């Protein structure tokens, strides 16, 4: 299952999976563009990027910084059923 985390000002959406038994969490990035989407996956806590489609190197660097700044929250929420469950909303 994937849980919505945040939508950035440029409409890039960030979602994450539940924590897997090995402690990993899949973080998915998707940005709508004309004719489709740019997308990428990064696995926490290793910060291993894969399946990058449409994003440029500079984009990934920016997303990586955002991910580093938010990883502690994403890892916590991944164990709580996403932000909505963790926050009690």
Describe the predicted segments one by one.
Residues 1-16:
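Negatively charged, low-complexity tracts enriched in Asp/Glu with abundant Ser/Thr
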Residues 9, 17, 28-30, 69, ...:
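Compositionally biased, intrinsically disordered low-complexity segments
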Residues 2, 35-44, 82-89:
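Alpha-helical membrane insertion/targeting regions
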Residues 15-56:
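A short, structured beta-strand/loop element
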Residues 3-4, 28-29, 61:
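Intrinsically disordered, low-complexity segments enriched in polar/charged residues with Gly/Pro
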